[in-house]
A protein has these predicted regions:
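Alpha-helical transmembrane segments
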Residues: 98, 219-224
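Intrinsic disorder in cytosolic terminal tails and internal cytosolic loops
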Residues: 1-22, 206-209, 461-476
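Membrane-interface helix caps and helix-loop-helix hairpins in membrane proteins
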Residues: 113, 177, 203-209, 234-240, ...
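Conserved aromatic/hydrophobic "specificity hotspots" at molecular recognition or selectivity sites
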Residues: 178-218, 266, 276, 473-476
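12-transmembrane solute porter fold
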Residues: 24-48, 59, 65-69, 134, ...
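Alpha-helical transmembrane segments and their membrane-interface exit regions
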Residues: 190-194, 251-257
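Transmembrane-helix bundle of Major Facilitator Superfamily
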Residues: 2-198, 322, 333-334, 341, ...
């Protein structure tokens, strides 16, 4: 999965400090930490059938095992970026890493649904504190051409994380067992925790920015949790069920209240007015759809290959490798197209490819060969969409707003994964809980329709032509 950066810190006026001689070691260490966070999005998918069998968990609970992490990672990411400014980036990284390690240990020791989902929530909280602070550190540690190179390495961790995640998940589940997909974070996290103060400077906190929009963070997280609850419930009770409709309606109300709160507070978590700008709105839309589709496909594929075909977790992980590589290939090709054509056409082409890949599986037959082929085609398209979304949103942004725009886009990135898994879990419910394939066909057909509709929306919504770079002050 292509994974873009959560936020960028504001630029500071004044003469830059001399290069830190430890900067490349710091990048390597922070890269390991960020890779660990990205791994935990995809590493779980391959292990879900084993987790369900061992702990006696049903479809709905297994869906929450995936979504709880991305929900809190995305819902609290902007708050994490704000706290990094208030408390200092290194302090927040250490706190976030400590929480993540403890939550990983709890997840690995889980003996039931409550402890496992609670551990995943804790992992999401730790990731939301660690990731934006780590990126802020990378951005302030490097300057000029070195900064561009460092941020390129950071962005590349996304695709690598997806590929390593599915392989590692399969290998650990087939070897020492599914609990080790969580336990592996403990020694790695502790090593980073001990080493980090030795290679990363203690950045200054900003005492003049003590206000933190905690209500905003809680509102957007609660709204998305309510939406996911409604979507997951639909798989058992139906889309017209009272509980389903009530949960979705409550989510809509909470999102509206969030918008009101963000306009009223002095230091908002998200400047809602950014979403009135066509580039930022376009980027947020693309990241929401692309991440939802990709993580949903990992979820569907894992259950199909293991439960319906009887494949081992290791073989499933290996079969997902072309899908993960396809995402990276699509991102590489997409970056060249975006440079030449702008974001609109590559996004539309990418979404059309995603629709074609999922439609291939839905229309012909759900077989292992077609499954992997279709998902690989879809992943190439979605890789291009990730690049289009990020570049469209950030290229025209003024320097002082690039961090805000990046934070908005990447919040939609993480929340898209949570919503996508919830949707396909309900659509494919008959196949996830029984021997029939009709649920998989329904889910893949729906994803193909989503791809087509999203491609049409992209053509209408994204600015035409090559993307303009910011070249002067913006007047409001």
């Amino acid at each position: 999965m292509a994974h873009s950066s959560p936020a960028s810190p504001p630029s500071h006026v004044g003469r830059p400090e001399p290069p830190d001689p430890r900067r490349w070691r710091a990048l390597a260490l922070l890269g390991v930490a960020q890779l660990m966070l990205i791994l935990d999005v995809t590493v779980v998918n391959v292990a879900l059938p084993d987790i369900g069998a061992d702990l006696g968990l049903g479809r709905a609970t297994l869906t929450w095992v995936v979504t709880a992490y991305t929900l809190f990672f995305g819902g609290l990411m902007l708050l994490g970026g704000r706290l990094a400014d208030v408390l200092g980036a290194r302090r927040l990284m250490l706190a976030g890493l400590g929480i993540f390690v403890l939550a990983s240990l709890a997840s690995g020791l889980a003996n039931g649904a409550a402890m496992l989902v609670g551990g995943r929530v804790g992992q999401g909280l730790g990731a939301a504190l660690l990731s934006p602070a780590a990126l802020a550190t990378v951005t302030t540690t490097f300057h000029g051409a070195e900064r561009t190179k460092a941020l390129g390495v950071w962005a590349a961790l996304g695709g690598a994380g997806s590929a390593i995640g599915v392989l590692l998940g399969g290998a650990l589940t087939a070897g020492p067992g599914w609990r080790w997909i969580f336990f592996i974070n403990v020694p790695v996290g502790l090593a980073v925790l001990v080493t980090l103060p030795l290679v990363v400077r203690a950045g200054a906190a900003h005492p003049g920015t003590r206000r933190v929009d905690l209500p905003g963070a809680l509102l957007v997280t609660a709204a998305t949790a309510s939406l996911i609850y409604g979507l997951v419930n639909a798989g058992d009770a139906g889309w017209g069920d009272t509980v389903t409709l009530t949960a979705v309606a409550a989510a809509a109300v909470l999102y509206a209240v969030f918008g009101v709160v963000e306009r009223a507070v002095r230091t908002p978590l998200m400047r809602v007015r950014l979403l009135t700008r066509r580039p930022v709105l376009s980027g947020a839309f693309l990241m929401l759809v692309a991440t939802g589709m990709l993580i949903g496909l990992f979820f569907l594929g894992s259950f199909y290959l293991q439960r319906h075909q009887g494949y081992s977790a290791l073989l499933t992980g290996l079969l997902f490798l072309p899908v993960a590589v396809g995402t990276g290939l699509g991102a590489h090709l997409g970056s060249h197209l975006v440079d030449r054509l702008g974001g609109r056409l590559p996004a539309a082409i990418g979404l059309t490819l995603a629709a074609a890949g999922t439609g291939l599986v839905a229309l012909l037959a759900v077989t292992p060969t077609l499954m992997v082929t279709g998902l690989t085609v879809a992943s190439i398209g979605l890789g291009a969409v990730f690049v289009s979304g990020t570049t469209t949103a950030l290229a025209p942004a003024a320097p002082e707003e690039s961090g805000l725009a990046s934070g908005v886009v990447n919040t939609f990135h993480e929340l898209g994964g949570a919503v996508g898994v919830a949707v396909v879990s309900s659509l494919a419910a008959p196949s996830l809980t029984g021997p029939v394939l009709t649920g998989f066909t329904t889910a893949f057909t729906s994803w193909a329709v989503v791809g087509v509709v999203a491609a049409l929306v992209a053509l209408a919504l994204l600015p035409p032509g090559r993307l303009p770079a910011f070249d002067g002050p913006r007047v409001h």
